[in-house]
């Protein structure tokens, strides 16, 4: 598939290509995402359910919704969305991630449309979705505004985008770079570039410039004793997640 690479940072892609086989190893190089996934999913599902008036306790609550997981990796978010009944497209510019994602979905009995493509290429193809999951991606792209604008164009009017990233401050440098990559060695050194992190105010401004309406944001806070993540209304100092609507 031809991919428009306007916002793709090839050096960032190479990092994740090298780790592709480990996506579904909860003790491997993607352990931080496995630990974070429950709180990410809680936020995502509640926001989508609220936007579309869905009851999460009902069978297949997202049936009839078309959801894009951009930068899908091995499918850690795409698979739960499919289990909730959504029609899911998983897109990744790192082609090496996709065989892992496809194989795991097949073994799990899930139908997910995984594609080696980019946000810009999907826009050019005229694709649109009820929701776009844009989780831990924006800090890896070459042009955040162009990328977020493409993501906005992929939303149907009234659609919702969930976007998570890392704040840029001394605490995030200490925890996400020094702690995670050098001390705890949860991630390979160089996985993140602290200079590409975005403060909540910076991300809000970019979302607005892209034509989106930010409606919610929460911090995601890690407790090293319990090894669990939780949502916070106040602490957005390291990881945080936002919800934005494309105006109808």
Swiss-Prot record:
Keyword field contains Chaperone: no
Q: What is its EC number?
A: 2.1.1.222, 2.1.1.64
Tell me which domain of life the UniProt entry assigns to the organism this sequence originates from: Bacteria
Q: In which pathway does it act?
A: Cofactor biosynthesis; ubiquinone biosynthesis
GO terms, biological process: methylation
**Entry's Pfam families?**
Methyltransf_23
What reaction gets catalysed by this protein?
a 3-demethylubiquinol + S-adenosyl-L-methionine = a ubiquinol + S-adenosyl-L-homocysteine + H(+); a 3-(all-trans-polyprenyl)benzene-1,2-diol + S-adenosyl-L-methionine = a 2-methoxy-6-(all-trans-polyprenyl)phenol + S-adenosyl-L-homocysteine + H(+)
**What keywords appear on the UniProt entry?**
Methyltransferase, S-adenosyl-L-methionine, Transferase, Ubiquinone biosynthesis
Binding positions for S-adenosyl-L-methionine per the UniProt entry: 40, 71, 92, 135
Q: Name one GO molecular function term.
A: polyprenyldihydroxybenzoate methyltransferase activity
- Keyword DNA-binding listed: no
Name the job this protein performs.
Answer: O-methyltransferase that catalyzes the 2 O-methylation steps in the ubiquinone biosynthetic pathway.
Give the family from UniProt. Belongs to the methyltransferase superfamily. UbiG/COQ3 family.
Alphabetical list of HAMAP family matching this protein = UbiG
Protein name according to UniProt: Ubiquinone biosynthesis O-methyltransferase
